[in-house]
Structure formats: structure tokens, C-alpha cells
């Protein structure tokens, strides 16, 4: 989405797509000296938007075919590589601070040049990332919004802070986009350090357990699996979104001051 940077799938698949896009852009830039991030600025916007998926405990929302986990920071690293390769200081500062926030050990010993194995792949793989030591880690509040709404996946978030213990949050999702399922509205709550009523996501056994089969209307069947020889799209990629009539606060820009009350 050019306005929000959110890919039109659930968080689990969105992060995979973003990882692949940024990986290709890095490869393209390094070997052909063509800046795809400049040509497609929505890429950097998409990377900057990924923290919006986070609960105050730093784990991502689990709606749709998603397994809750932590943020993949590889796309952030690649935005830094892109900035360094093309002399974009402002972009380097922004994403370096973000990377140090979500991955404090990035660029340290395990990423050191000495740890790179001697291999033919070293001619093609990404080289160890060197971070500017003068750039300090950002604060997580700089990268999330008190209120965030992505209509292309019919998903909104309200939060009053990012304190793992004391902050509250709600993640509300209908069914719009891919891997979302047409079985109503998903609502995940957060309080006292816990995700309350977490979405079942892809289930305990990654699509193959009864918890997945009995929660959703069918197994995934438009991707690589055909159930009873029939593959159907309407259940997995549906168009059953909710309409956001009003909200407070209005702005969804990250870094805005949190309010004690939010409304939608």
C-alpha cells in the first residue's frame, strides 16, 4: 500500500515477501549499481512500517496464517546497505537507529569479517554489515503509532504505549487480502505483559493439526495444497473487510505522543 507500506497479506507472509523484495533489491544494487529502493520508494516505507505489527512485548500480531514471533530485521539491515552503497545519509541514520533498537547485537562479533567462511558463495552473499558507531539506538516508540489502520488488510491497531508490562493494545482484523480466512473478525488484546485471546494463526502444528482445521473453514488450498483435489480461493483470499467510521487519535504517523484513551 503506497500510503501505509503494508503488504496485502497477513503478517507472516508479508514479512516473507518483504524479506525477498529487499534481498533482490540489494543483489540488484550491488551487481548492477541500480538503486531499486530509489525507483520503488514504497520498499523503504514498507520496512519502516513493520514495527506496527508489534505488541508491547515485541512479538508480532498473529492474525491470518501467521505464527507469532519476533520481527525479522534483515529488511532493516538491507535498507542500511542500500543507504551506504548510494550515499543516503538520512536513510542510513534512520534505519541504523531502528536496527539497533530491535537487534542490539547487529554488526557486532558474530557479524565480524573474521566470521565469514571461506567459500565460493562469499562472492555473491551479502558482506558483513558495518554500522556507524556514532548512531545511537532508537526507541521503539519512534516506530509505532498510537493508532494505525491498514485498509488493504482490514486491520487496525490501538495502543497507549509500548511498555511490556503496563501498556495496553488491541489488534483488530477482518478478512481482506491473502491468507486471511473468511471466518469473522479477529481481535487480539494485550495487557499486563500478555497477549490475551491470541489468534490461532497457523495452529500449533503449522497447518496440519486439528486446532487449525477446526478453527478455520478449511485447510489452505490455494497455495501448494489441494484438499480433496479441489483448490479454492474465496475462503483464503476473501473480501470481507470492516469499515472504519471514525477514530481517535486521527494521525497514524509513528512517533506521535501516546494518549491514555484511544477510540474507533
Spell out what each predicted region is.
Residues 8-264:
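Extended polysaccharide-engagement surfaces of secreted carbohydrate-active enzymes
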